């Protein structure tokens, strides 16, 4: 079977052969893979495919395999957040997005590797070991949804789901040369997502083309009463697949370029922006002055929420349990021995930020900065349809390069965390290369204006070939 199939390609293969044969081909690719992108595959995948062939399962994604990040609950299929503390945990229910995918006929083919509890930018903190970037096996795939991006880039799944708390869909999409969308906060239900930071994260799709992103969003998007942050606003993503950006007003934030940005990355992004000008869009620079405070505010908020969210993992109900003479000793030993170093670091920092005497100084100040960052976006979208910037300031770095310096990893999230603070949607699309490694163009839209993102990204794809580049070649 040919690798790197789109949804429409998969449907053609199914029509020519069968859903069972297509699913079996993907399972064979996964079995032979050397990138460590999956944590497990689904025993029920072939059964679902057979049901599609019999006409017992139908829908817009009938028979299409999809890979799921390991922090999204899948009934009967292990969901561990790539952490020892959830070893062996099998959810008794499906996340809302999984319910939607199954209703649409999709085949859940397996779970993908990730940074432990979605805390990281490299997938190096996984208890299953690092996922390798398909473009260069000595480099990271990005994170925290590194497995989800890598398996799509390697042709081991046509589409995947990740989660994005501060860039965790867009970063690996950029590093692996695929398309990744972070929807507006509230546009996709978080029911069944094992939370890192509730007020920041969203589930989003990854694929080799914008068309597939739109198709998946039309399935998983929409209101869910079980998620109190879910907003009842219907968006027709596929209707926005229009190759026309004439009159599109693009804002280019000064603060997302310059010092710290790799020159090859910056050149590729400017080439992309100039391409839009050739396509009759217009661009203008814009200042977003509070960007310089966003990173500190983001990590203060995210770690504070993490310290609260992860308090529930203590070995009492699931996962490994260490012996102790009482509950406190048992829980303390269990957490100390089964949470990884990065997760422990973030829990400690978050607990400190929320502690008596420091909450006003750090956490509440961070919330005030969050409002200022959102106001920057509000002002920008009063004049522009979309904003454009590099997704990441540099291409994929080498495995182990930043492990001993966590602050350096935090800093490279500088271009992605502001959108999570503001809750606005954004998409990363391949726009070229730097030293033979993929570069992502980040397109940012106003709240619930995913249509503008998809239209802009789709038009770029139709007029360039960057999204067609595959590991082993450069567009």
UniProtKB/Swiss-Prot annotation:
Enzyme Commission code(s) on record: 6.3.5.7
UniProt xrefs under InterPro entries: Amidase, Amidase_CS, Amidase_dom, AS_sf, GatA
Active site residues per record: 69 (charge relay system), 144 (charge relay system), 168 (acyl-ester intermediate)
GO cellular component: glutamyl-tRNA(Gln) amidotransferase complex
Main EC class the enzyme belongs to: ligase
Record keywords: ATP-binding, Ligase, Nucleotide-binding, Protein biosynthesis
Swiss-Prot/TrEMBL catalytic activity: L-glutamyl-tRNA(Gln) + L-glutamine + ATP + H2O = L-glutaminyl-tRNA(Gln) + L-glutamate + ADP + phosphate + H(+)
Record-level Gene Ontology MF annotations: ATP binding; glutaminyl-tRNA synthase (glutamine-hydrolyzing) activity
Gene Ontology terms: biological process: translation
Function field: Allows the formation of correctly charged Gln-tRNA(Gln) through the transamidation of misacylated Glu-tRNA(Gln) in organisms which lack glutaminyl-tRNA synthetase. The reaction takes place in the presence of glutamine and ATP through an activated gamma-phospho-Glu-tRNA(Gln).
Family of this protein: Belongs to the amidase family. GatA subfamily.
Quaternary assembly: Heterotrimer of A, B and C subunits.
Entry-linked NCBIfam families: gatA
Protein name per UniProt: Glutamyl-tRNA(Gln) amidotransferase subunit A
Source organism: Methanococcoides burtonii (strain DSM 6242 / NBRC 107633 / OCM 468 / ACE-M)
């Amino acid at each position: 079977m040919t690798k790197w199939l789109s949804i429409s390609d998969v449907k053609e293969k199914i029509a020519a052969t069968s859903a069972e044969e297509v699913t079996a081909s993907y399972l064979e690719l996964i079995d032979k893979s050397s990138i460590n992108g999956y944590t497990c595959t689904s025993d029920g995948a072939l059964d679902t495919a057979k049901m599609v062939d019999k006409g017992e399962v139908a829908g817009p994604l009938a028979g299409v395999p999809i890979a799921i990040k390991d922090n999204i609950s899948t009934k009967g299929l292990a969901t561990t957040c790539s952490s020892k503390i959830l070893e062996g945990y099998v959810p008794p229910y499906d996340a809302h997005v999984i319910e939607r995918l199954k209703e649409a006929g999709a085949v859940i083919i397996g779970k993908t590797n990730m940074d432990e509890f979605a805390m990281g930018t490299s997938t190096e903190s996984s208890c299953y070991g690092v996922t390798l970037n398909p473009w260069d096996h000595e480099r990271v795939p990005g994170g925290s949804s590194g497995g989800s991006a890598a398996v799509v880039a390697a042709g081991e799944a046509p589409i995947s789901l990740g989660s994005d708390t501060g860039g965790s869909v867009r970063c690996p999409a950029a590093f692996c040369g695929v398309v990744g969308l972070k929807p507006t906060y509230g546009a996709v239900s978080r029911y069944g997502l094992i939370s890192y930071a509730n007020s920041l994260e969203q589930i989003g799709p990854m694929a080799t083309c914008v068309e597939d992103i739109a198709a998946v969003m039309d399935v998983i998007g929409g209101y869910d009463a079980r998620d109190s942050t879910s907003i009842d606003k219907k968006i027709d993503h596929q209707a926005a697949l229009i190759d026309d950006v004439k009159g599109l007003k693009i804002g280019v934030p000064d603060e997302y370029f310059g010092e710290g940005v790799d020159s090859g990355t910056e050149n590729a992004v400017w080439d992309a922006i100039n391409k839009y000008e050739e396509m009759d869009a217009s661009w203008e620079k814009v200042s977003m002055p509070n960007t310089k405070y966003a990173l500190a505010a983001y990590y203060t908020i995210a770690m504070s929420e993490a310290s609260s969210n992860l308090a529930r993992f203590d070995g009492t109900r699931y996962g490994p349990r260490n012996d102790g003479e009482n509950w406190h000793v048992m829980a303390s030993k269990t957490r100390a021995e089964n949470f990884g170093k990065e997760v422990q670091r973030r829990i400690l920092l978050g607990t400190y930020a929320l502690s008596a005497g420091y909450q006003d100084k750090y956490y509440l100040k961070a919330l005030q900065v969050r409002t200022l960052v959102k106001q920057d976006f509000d002002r920008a979208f009063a004049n522009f349809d979309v904003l454009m910037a590099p997704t990441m300031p540099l291409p994929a770095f080498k495995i182990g390069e930043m492990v001993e310096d966590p602050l350096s990893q935090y800093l490279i999230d500088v271009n992605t965390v502001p959108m999570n603070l503001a809750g606005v949607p954004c998409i990363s699309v391949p726009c070229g290369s730097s030293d033979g490694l993929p570069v992502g163009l980040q397109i940012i839209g106003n709240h619930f204006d995913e249509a503008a993102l998809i239209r802009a990204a789709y038009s770029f794809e139709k007029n360039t070939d960057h999204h067609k580049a595959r590991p082993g070649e450069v567009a």
